[in-house]
Amino acid sequence: MGIRAIVVDTAGTTTDLTFIQDVLFPYSVKALPDFLAQNQHNVLVENCICDTRDIALEPDADLNRVTEILQQWVREDRKATPLKTLQGLIWKQGYAHDEFKGHIFPDFIEAVKRFSAQNLRIYSFSSGSVDAQKLLFSHSDGGDLTEMFNGHFDTRTGNKLDKQAYCNILNTISLSPKQVLFVSDVIEELKAADAAGMMTCQMVRDSKQRTGDFRTINSFDKLVIE
């Protein structure tokens, strides 16, 4: 049957964690107050504000309090959908104004071209919104890579630590589990994908990184799909 599709995690796998933690997250924390004040009546932003109140169990929170909640969630690396949606919108402005370029490991840039030439389908799965993923890959330091991808998945598909999220991906792309390889640096995500029947491979870019019983690679150069 063989592998027909590869699903990649982003942070720590295709993208350096320090870019997320030291560039993108601080940028969103700093930009949130003005962004919410200027866009609070935009339907999408308004929905995110309402969802934040609901999740925080603070239905009467004013805009300043909502901003504080969201900024705290960034610091806690919460995977809340309204936060991830707002971050995607904020980062879109940052990319548009050339505040930063999306960091992509060079070995993935070369590998994604190789996989595409092999007619393998390529998807990304991240706790960051689909829009944020598209921005990352379209404004990457390796150029626009979006045409190499067949799709992207985020928290709307499910929690990355839950088996059901990977079952949902399989249903969406209409492939059997053994036809799909999931690559991530996080053991718990690999366990969830494995429980759904997917093939798995752990990306270990740091020698101090925790590993499990999964096949490991330290670069996409080492990932050969026959």
From Swiss-Prot:
Q: Which Pfam families match?
A: Hydrolase
Could you say which protein family the record assigns here?
A: Belongs to the HAD-like hydrolase superfamily. MasA/MtnC family.
The record describes its quaternary structure and partners as: Monomer.
This protein is called: Enolase-phosphatase E1
> SUPFAM superfamilies attached here?
HAD-like
Reaction equations catalysed: 5-methylsulfanyl-2,3-dioxopentyl phosphate + H2O = 1,2-dihydroxy-5-(methylsulfanyl)pent-1-en-3-one + phosphate
This protein's pathway reads: Amino-acid biosynthesis; L-methionine biosynthesis via salvage pathway; L-methionine from S-methyl-5-thio-alpha-D-ribose 1-phosphate: step 3/6; Amino-acid biosynthesis; L-methionine biosynthesis via salvage pathway; L-methionine from S-methyl-5-thio-alpha-D-ribose 1-phosphate: step 4/6
Matches recorded under InterPro entries: Enolase-ppase_E1, HAD-like_sf, HAD-SF_hydro_IA, HAD_sf
Q: What does this protein do?
A: Bifunctional enzyme that catalyzes the enolization of 2,3-diketo-5-methylthiopentyl-1-phosphate (DK-MTP-1-P) into the intermediate 2-hydroxy-3-keto-5-methylthiopentenyl-1-phosphate (HK-MTPenyl-1-P), which is then dephosphorylated to form the acireductone 1,2-dihydroxy-3-keto-5-methylthiopentene (DHK-MTPene).
Might you give the EC number(s) for this enzyme? Answer: 3.1.3.77
For activity, the cofactor(s) needed are: Mg(2+)
